[in-house]
Amino acid sequence: MAGASMNDIKARIKSVQSTMQITKAMELVATSKLRRAKEKAESCRPFYEVLKGAIDDVFSSCELRDSAFSKKGEGGRTLYVVIAGDRGLAGGYNANIFRLVANLAREKEGVILPIGKKALEYYKHRNAEIFSDAFPSVAEVGVGDCLAIAEEICNSFKAGNFEQVVLVYTKFVSMISQVPVYEDLLPLVSNHEGEPLEFMPLIESDPEELLEAIVPEFLGGILWSSVCESLASESGARRSAMNAANKNAGEIIDTLMLKYNRARQAVITQEITEIVSGAEVL
């Protein structure tokens, strides 16, 4: 009986060790990807800040306050641009994004533009209204794709299909911290509103034509920066999850080894007892 128990424990130890080899390999891969994704995300942040500052300066002109991009659409619905991951095994990375979208959508009816395999699968499975399913892999989204998405969003917003457009993604804070956030993309709101500017921007062309040209570029830049942040966050979350899995596996192996040694000691004790008993009979 004890022998069978020992064999079961040995089999469980081997199983956990095999799983641990996989999670260690995944942690190494995630660490490698995280390093590159982190550099890309950090390099995009100055670009993001410049874009935000430029659009604020341009939009601070009173001539642009009545633009189609500054008014809420008449559709009464919100377009949620949701950036999630392409794979699982990343802790609560994807679940946290979906929870944030669900909280936002409680207040307003929403249409989803999913970016990433998990986002597309999640919302299709729940029969959500999908704006576009053209971006099933966030890892394959490039700058050109972000500009194309932005152009499509701007055209739909100007047509009055949506009251507002909200971007939901995960901001990379550190190797161990990633925060799901949301940002209103449209309608445009100037951060300078109510504040006097040191100078008013000089706009030589037609204001509406200017916005027609720069808003899609602006939104495309914001989307690209958010994609980079999300990729770094996914790799960071996966690395943390695999690291935790490795620690748990190590603890399980230690516990099983303790059980195995106790069972082995019990078998040896029993054998010694039987030998001693046999010797006494003789």
Question: For the regions a protein language model found, what residue spans apply to each?
Answer:
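C-terminal beta-strand-loop-alpha-helix "lid" module of Rossmann-like NAD(P)-dependent dehydrogenases
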Residues: 1-282
